[in-house]
């Protein structure tokens, strides 16, 4: 299922440096173009959430300006980290950097993929081979990795975490984790996982979301532990589709919760909670509002793969809901391309 043709150049949308800036203290994503705009657009809700004094607001302004500067430097700094890691880091479990083998994958996942590429495969038959977490929300679960592979990957991630190598934040909300492309795991692990296994599966589950046109991804591991990140606020992903796999370790709490699609006015009415099962992956639409409940005890590590289809996002950026203003970027960027493949309709509200 690999994409054939010349290498493609990927971009991000310019809104990355202005929109969806997360303020954890107030549990709010904001668009930031300056002090007056921030006061005008968010003054009442900020005051209702505790930003009441002049000092509070000035502290918020400083944090937002710092975050914008961080995002502006992100591509260059990420490339520098990746180069240093490639030249200087010594893995503890070098076998996880080998090309993805079937032995790393759960038998159920291999069976689901084998069915997905069979001539007579259809959605009804596929759903008999998956756990449907929510038919209404189109959330599914399937074992992805074997227990030995999860353990080996975790050991490698912990070894890297404890090394003196530079580390980038996994995303704009989490502070602890690992960017897999910086560690050198995109080419051997994540790209084959997307191309060979996830694309045929997603093509049947989510054809209206570009499931059959996935051409890039962003993969990272997030870590939750006492004294570090404990929970994750409600958000939606910069992705058409998402795979979230629990890697371990031993923990309590931290369940995922899901609302509706972010465009819906009652998107967080009666959220659905989903417990983690080590080795199993939860599949959902990127636009599905979700978060993570507070960790109780232990450490929780999850692999998150944002799956992207330029045929969808080239016409509408999911983060600013406008036609993307393209900016050249490193690697897969945020999944946009300057060339125009045939587009598909974005996910409908269901």
Curated annotation (Swiss-Prot):
Fe cation binds at residues 235, 237, 290. The keyword Transmembrane does not apply. Binds 1 Fe(2+) ion per subunit. 2-oxoglutarate binds at residue 300. Keywords: Dioxygenase, Iron, Metal-binding, Oxidoreductase, Vitamin C. Residues 215-309 form the Fe2OG dioxygenase domain. The keyword rRNA-binding does not apply. Its EC number is 1.14.11.-. It holds the Pfam family OGFOD2-like. This is 2-oxoglutarate and iron-dependent oxygenase domain-containing protein 2. It comes from Homo sapiens. Belongs to the OGFOD2 family. Its cofactor is Fe(2+); L-ascorbate. PROSITE patterns: FE2OG_OXY. InterPro entries: Oxoglu/Fe-dep_dioxygenase_dom (IPR005123), Pro_4_hyd_alph (IPR006620). GO terms for molecular function: dioxygenase activity; iron ion binding; L-ascorbic acid binding; oxidoreductase activity, acting on paired donors, with incorporation or reduction of molecular oxygen.
